[in-house]
Amino acid sequence: MITKQDKNQVRKKRHARVRSKISGTAERPRLNVFRSNKNIYAQLIDDVAGVTIVSASSQENGFEGAGSNVEAASKIGETIAKRAAEKNITAVVFDRGGYLYHGRVKALAEAARENGLEF
């Protein structure tokens, strides 16, 4: 009998493959996206120093509405772009975290682009 692979395990393998090819620096950090059933998270990471420069999530105080829909992802994209601008970061490397570029991940990326991040 053929056993079906766990979706999350497949995503993690895909993410590891992508991560072997991309990394962030202080000048051009990695914009990492993590999606859960209840929330969405974004971080700007300097992989050379191993430091998170800026982060945003739908769990933060002051965030209203559902935490894990397309509208929430758009708000997080705007927030991460504004916080990056405060730290004088304009260019990033996008890391979709092994997720398909669709739905919440796409909404976050497009909102970040519209608010000044280049990738």
Curated annotation (Swiss-Prot):
<dbReference type="InterPro" id="IPR005484">
    <property type="entry name" value="Ribosomal_uL18_bac/euk"/>
</dbReference>
<dbReference type="GO" id="GO:0006412">
    <property type="term" value="P:translation"/>
</dbReference>
<dbReference type="Pfam" id="PF00861">
    <property type="entry name" value="Ribosomal_L18p"/>
</dbReference>
<dbReference type="GO" id="GO:0008097">
    <property type="term" value="F:5S rRNA binding"/>
</dbReference>
<keyword id="KW-0689">Ribosomal protein</keyword>
<dbReference type="InterPro" id="IPR004389">
    <property type="entry name" value="Ribosomal_uL18_bac-type"/>
</dbReference>
<comment type="similarity">
    <text>Belongs to the universal ribosomal protein uL18 family.</text>
</comment>
<keyword id="KW-0694">RNA-binding</keyword>
<comment type="subunit">
    <text>Part of the 50S ribosomal subunit; part of the 5S rRNA/L5/L18/L25 subcomplex. Contacts the 5S and 23S rRNAs.</text>
</comment>
<comment type="function">
    <text>This is one of the proteins that bind and probably mediate the attachment of the 5S RNA into the large ribosomal subunit, where it forms part of the central protuberance.</text>
</comment>
<dbReference type="GO" id="GO:0022625">
    <property type="term" value="C:cytosolic large ribosomal subunit"/>
</dbReference>
<feature type="region of interest" description="Disordered">
    <location>
        <begin position="1"/>
        <end position="24"/>
    </location>
</feature>
<keyword id="KW-0699">rRNA-binding</keyword>
<dbReference type="GO" id="GO:0003735">
    <property type="term" value="F:structural constituent of ribosome"/>
</dbReference>
<feature type="compositionally biased region" description="Basic residues">
    <location>
        <begin position="10"/>
        <end position="20"/>
    </location>
</feature>
<protein>
    <recommendedName>
        <fullName>Large ribosomal subunit protein uL18</fullName>
    </recommendedName>
</protein>
<keyword id="KW-0687">Ribonucleoprotein</keyword>
